[in-house]
Amino acid sequence: MWTDERGSEVLDPPECRRLLAIGAKEHLPGHLAVADGSVPLVLPLDYSVHESDIIVRVGEGLFSSLVDRLVAFEVDGRVGHQGLRGIEDVCEWSVLAQGLATEVKAASLGRYLPQPRVAEPGHRLVRIRTDVLTGRRLHPAGS
């Protein structure tokens, strides 16, 4: 990992995968981006991670807009830790995955199904490959 010209720590793919898994375990919402016709659409979704892929649950309408298309999926998180003089510092992170979305059957996922927090999350499962995986970690100024 290295620091870019703006002071953000650039994360390597293994660290991005680790943070995606933490985000899923902590039920952080992800944001799915897809072009719906000529209009970009970004939706918050619960997700899970299976192997190196992202799994989301969607309804029929969105399903037809996603399957066999390139999409983007983004997750943000915050981590607090003890800093100098006992003050808690918070660093923030963001991971962006880009890849092909395909249908997946629940039977092939076992315990890796997304755990939705909404009453009607949809019944179709979509696998998003992490063909391109990038991330940044932002540290507090002066740390």
Predicted regions and their residues:
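Extreme N-terminal tail/first-helix region
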Residues: 1-23
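Short, charged, intrinsically disordered terminal tails
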Residues: 2-9, 107, 127-129, 133-143
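Intrinsically disordered, low-complexity coil segments
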Residues: 21-30, 36-37, 79-92
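Short beta-strand segments
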Residues: 26-59
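A generic structural motif
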Residues: 49-51, 105, 134
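Short beta-strand segments in beta-sandwich/barrel cores
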Residues: 54, 101, 133
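Short hydrophobic/aromatic-rich beta-strand segments that constitute the beta-sheet cores
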Residues: 56-58, 73, 135
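Short, structured beta-strand-loop surface elements
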Residues: 60-124, 130
